[in-house]
A protein has these predicted regions:
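Glycine-centered coil/turn sites that cap beta-strands in beta-rich domains
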Residues: 385-403, 407-428, 437, 449-455, ...
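C-terminal tail/sorting-segment detector
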Residues: 451, 455, 459-481
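Sec-dependent N-terminal signal peptides
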Residues: 4-15
Length: 481
């Protein structure tokens, strides 16, 4: 589906106005007298499967630092109570999470054994029960800042480790969903520091990126694997400038690898982006995404076909706040920066996730005196299933009858727009209650098809309504299960 990146650059969803309207209020997820902290941006702090969200963090409420977890079963509307995942006399911190179906995997750094090691645990029932802690590393040095990703039964964890004197990047893989683990693999080898690795997997294609100062200043490097992390390419230098490139975050779908990082080449720290179309072998040019007087740090990236979402922390307004921007054409163009937080405290290390049409962000925030975990969502910030079927400008507005009708549970809705402008396509029940929003933002002129999946609704009569400028049309559809 990422062919949209090539075929439809004219699909310029200028979503900034729509996303401003749709981002909901901040939600405080933790409430205790200690500090609640997320991992750095090399790791994912929030993950999802469908409408079920899962997040992890470090918390000192029990005297020493432990790993905590909580979930939402309704796309972030409500959240369950905090669950303590670790319980030992050492400190546990920098947790990273991956979710696939009902399987939740968490990895973190832990010094219960005297030195810092990488640990792992998982749940196979959606977070209700958890396995015992599994120690993955065993050496006399420091192993920390883990990142995790999985595809099917293949799981890969990357981390930094100074068992060899200086920090190097290591990886470890499991071929059976985290039940058994293979030997550690050292991925970097130089006399300088290789740190803060971030990992992404799509099928058997694995990419790991990190920051490295072998060249005198910090640059971004990567390695890729085409066999699920069994063997690896050589090291590839991805940035090349006289300043510092740090804080890399990476994601992938098929052969498409998207990467963002912080870069000081322009005097202050800015957010940059680049992508690969061939699984991380070659990358396009660097793109500067921010241009502000304050420093921009710790970007987090999530993608869905041609839609690329990036959030980061930035101090252009005096204190650190969370900012966001979107590309709807595979990184060819970008929206303006959108400030998501606005309080007197510092908002830092945000982590972004996509679930269906919704966007979710968690971050650390000290507006309450101590640092707590906050959450924010945009229910329609990732417009899934919207496909441009023609860029020829139609003669007038048109809303077609859905097909098939009756349907179960998927149907298609076509609509035509003679002019660019704000468009809303929503579904309502018999009582007039809005039950789904398929489009809510700016669209270019053309003809589009929206895929609607009504798996969460019961059988009955529903209505879908298109609103565009002065045009409004409503049609009836029937769901039969």
């Amino acid at each position: 589906m990422k062919q949209i990146k090539f075929l439809f650059f004219t699909l310029l969803f200028c979503f900034q106005a729509g996303t401003i309207a749709q981002w909901e209020n901040d939600t405080r997820l933790t409430n205790n007298s200690s500090q609640s902290l997320l991992a750095y941006n090399n790791a994912k702090s929030i993950s999802s499967d469908g409408n079920t969200l899962h997040t992890v963090w470090t918390d000192g409420r029990d005297g020493n630092l432990e790993i905590y977890y909580k979930r939402s079963a309704n796309a972030g509307v409500n959240w369950n109570a905090d669950v303590r995942l670790t319980n030992n006399t050492g400190s546990s911190y920098y947790p990273a999470i991956h979710v696939g179906g009902n399987t939740i995997m968490v990895t973190w750094t832990d010094n219960r054994d005297g030195n810092y090691e990488i640990y792992f645990k998982k749940s196979e029932d959606g977070g209700s029960t958890w396995s015992t802690d599994t120690r993955l590393t065993n050496n006399a040095s420091l192993s920390d800042y883990p990142s995790i990703d999985a595809s099917g039964s293949t799981v890969v964890i990357s981390w930094q480790d100074n068992r060899d004197g200086n920090y190097e990047v290591y990886s470890k893989r499991s071929g059976d969903g985290g039940n058994n683990w293979e030997a550690d693999q050292r991925l970097s080898s130089n006399s300088a520091f290789s740190e803060y690795p971030t990992v992404t997997i799509s099928g058997l294609k694995v990419n790991i990126a990190w920051e490295d100062n072998r060249d005198g200043n910090r640059e971004i490097y990567n390695k890729y694997s085409t066999d699920g992390g069994v063997t690896w390419s050589g090291e590839n230098r991805l940035t090349n400038n006289s300043s510092q490139s740090t804080s890399v975050s990476i994601t992938s779908e098929g052969d498409f690898v998207d990467m963002t990082w912080s870069d000081q080449r322009d005097g202050n720290w800015e957010i940059y982006y680049k992508y690969s179309f061939d699984g991380g072998i070659n990358f396009g040019p660097d793109q500067r995404l921010t241009n502000a007087s304050g420093n921009s740090w710790y970007p987090s990236i999530a993608t869905d076909d041609a839609f690329i979402h990036i959030c980061w922390q930035e101090a252009r307004d005096g204190n650190n706040e969370v900012y966001y921007k979107i590309s709807t054409d595979g990184g060819a163009s970008w929206s303006g920066d959108l400030r998501l937080t606005n309080d007197a405290g510092a908002s830092s290390t945000p982590s972004i996730n996509i679930s269906g049409s919704a966007l979710h962000i968690v971050w650390s925030d000290n507006r309450d005196g101590n640092t707590e975990i906050y959450y924010k969502r945009n229910p329609s910030g990732n417009p899934i299933g919207i496909v441009p079927i023609s860029t020829t400008i139609p003669d007038g507005y048109k809303l077609s009858q859905n097909y098939p009708n009756p349907f179960n549970p998927v149907t298609n809705i076509e609509f035509a727009l003679p002019n660019a402008g704000y468009v809303k396509l929503a579904v309502y029940d018999m009582n007039g209650k809005e039950v789904a929003v398929l489009v809510n933002g700016q669209l270019a002129a053309g003809t589009y098809k929206a895929d609607y999946i009504a798996s969460s609704l019961s059988s009955g009569v529903y209505f879908y309504k298109l609103t565009a400028k002065d045009f409004t049309a409503t049609k009836k559809m029937i769901l039969i299960k």
